[in-house]
Amino acid sequence: MGVERIKAAFENGKKAFIPYVMGGDGGLEILKERIRFLDEAGASIVEIGIPFSDPVADGPTIQRAGKRALDSGVTVKGIFQALIEVRKEVQIPFVLMTYLNPVLAFGKERFIENCMEAGVDGIIVPDLPYEEQDIIAPLLREANIALIPLVTVTSPIERIKKIMSESEGFVYAVTVAGVTGVRQNFKDEIHSYLEKVKSHTHLPVVAGFGISTKEHVEEMVTICDGVVVGSKVIELLENEKREEICEFIQATKQKEEA
């Protein structure tokens, strides 16, 4: 399915709610159970983090989740195995968020073969510069797996246009300068930045980093095609406050009808 399964999540003006879960935080059975829950709750796409010892783009909540996963002995192979098993039960698109090092350490061809086997539809590599994406981009294209770009508020628009011109799936627009994590509010220039990004691509644009309240979700999906919520989802899953995740999903869907 790959790129097509991601496209379907945005069809007919649908707004996408994309929760992030750390692969192996709490164990692999927990990972499968959380994916099943998020699918049943109506999430559009699930983003699955591959834990890494030097996660430069992650805020403290995601770093802690990654450390818990690594400390428990979870492996990349184990995460793929869990995804292969849960893919038989769910149709929700899977997008992996991984640093480049785990891909290269695993072997990039082998990593992408495992992605295909596990029904992974897209991959985000936050520390892979646009200039070096040929390290994995041709292999991903061949496998029909979207390499999803990150664009940032500090990037010049010409660079953003170049990055987006060769992208697939959706564009991940980073809404803060810095790492992931919970924020109180967003500055006005974020709105004009998101509108600018949207005006230069035919792909859906999804806002992420720092989105932690229903108000943030409502604000962002008014401008964008969806949101990624990471740190807050990890926090809510950890504290068994799943009904609040359902409220986030509801807030996203309501904007489709607005």
From Swiss-Prot:
Q: Which UniProt keywords apply?
A: Amino-acid biosynthesis, Aromatic amino acid biosynthesis, Lyase, Tryptophan biosynthesis
- Determine the domain of life of the protein's source: Bacteria
User: Per the record's keyword annotation, is Amino-acid biosynthesis included, yes or no?
Assistant: yes
Gene Ontology molecular-function annotations = tryptophan synthase activity
Q: Does the keyword Amino-acid biosynthesis apply?
A: yes
* Location of the active site: 47, 58
Q: What is its EC number?
A: 4.2.1.20
A GO term from the CC aspect: cytosol
Gene3D superfamilies documented for this protein: Aldolase class I
Q: Show the SUPFAM superfamilies listed in the entry.
A: Ribulose-phoshate binding barrel (SSF51366)
Q: What class of enzyme is it?
A: lyase
Pathway field of the UniProt record reads: Amino-acid biosynthesis; L-tryptophan biosynthesis; L-tryptophan from chorismate: step 5/5
What does the sequence similarity comment in the record state about its family? Answer: Belongs to the TrpA family.
Q: Which PANTHER family match?
A: TRYPTOPHAN SYNTHASE ALPHA CHAIN, CHLOROPLASTIC, TRYPTOPHAN SYNTHASE, ALPHA CHAIN
Please give the subunit comment from the record. Answer: Tetramer of two alpha and two beta chains.
- Report the protein name in the record: Tryptophan synthase alpha chain
